[in-house]
């Protein structure tokens, strides 16, 4: 009789129990691991699977997380190069891809990452045909479109992390200037994640008080207080962090865990995330851009009809045209 048998009396033989709330993270670079630890700290999954092509790094990251099991509430952490390890995931988060270099525009990354997605997405679909896909790799709006096309999934199940982080950065920077916590600074950035994102100045408010009504020049070139600089800081922030530490990780990891929580707990919160916007705000092509979306366990169920000023809508359409110009040239 083994020590285990002496210690434990078995009363029911379990068949291999299937995870009910499994999350997979594809790519164990700085962003993937920041997503993983943020998800683990929020107790969102009963199983976390990690996938990557670099096997030593992958195993090392898995072991490092497993060694912290005592301090976590996720009973199973697994990893593998083979996508069989991802089977039956409810949510699959794609962070894999070529990393943005210092000074490199997100859109330059695109064809490099399309080729990587041609391998990843069919494997994810094979093992988790009913999952939600959350794309984080850049340029995120185009790669969300690519994931949608390759997966064959309905559009509500293919989500881009989009402007969830841009809006968080915006709220943080507004809060810094006002001396108020970002949770109480309500503001939205829509459109493309990154260089041509659109700040909705007309909707910025604190406790329902519209800042543009108090200060009509808000966000314009003629503003003596230069609030427009706040949006410029949002656009520049990733480039600044990359220049200083080589990559971004923590904020995007927290942002992704925020989205994962909304999905896994069916919270139906509204997030500025990338979805198919054809037919909205005058967009005519199959383009994914961030708009405020209701998110839950089945993915994106609804889109909030934002009231945008004509110049805000023009910027959104211009973003869509830029993205479509690149998308139509893609080889996949």
Curated annotation (Swiss-Prot):
Pathway: Fermentation; pyruvate fermentation to lactate; (S)-lactate from pyruvate: step 1/1. It is found in: Cytoplasm. Pfam families: Ldh_1_C, Ldh_1_N. GO terms for biological process: lactate metabolic process. InterPro entries: L-lactate/malate_DH, L-lactate_DH, L-lactate_DH_AS, Lactate/malate_DH_C, Lactate/malate_DH_N, Lactate_DH/Glyco_Ohase_4_C, NAD(P)-bd_dom_sf. SUPFAM superfamilies: LDH C-terminal domain-like (SSF56327), NAD(P)-binding Rossmann-fold domains (SSF51735). GO terms for cellular component: cytoplasm. Keywords: Cytoplasm, NAD, Oxidoreductase. The keyword NAD applies. Its EC number is 1.1.1.27. It catalyses: (S)-lactate + NAD(+) = pyruvate + NADH + H(+). Transmembrane segments: none annotated. HAMAP family: Lactate_dehydrog. Interconverts simultaneously and stereospecifically pyruvate and lactate with concomitant interconversion of NADH and NAD(+). This is L-lactate dehydrogenase A chain. It comes from Python regius. The gene is LDHA.
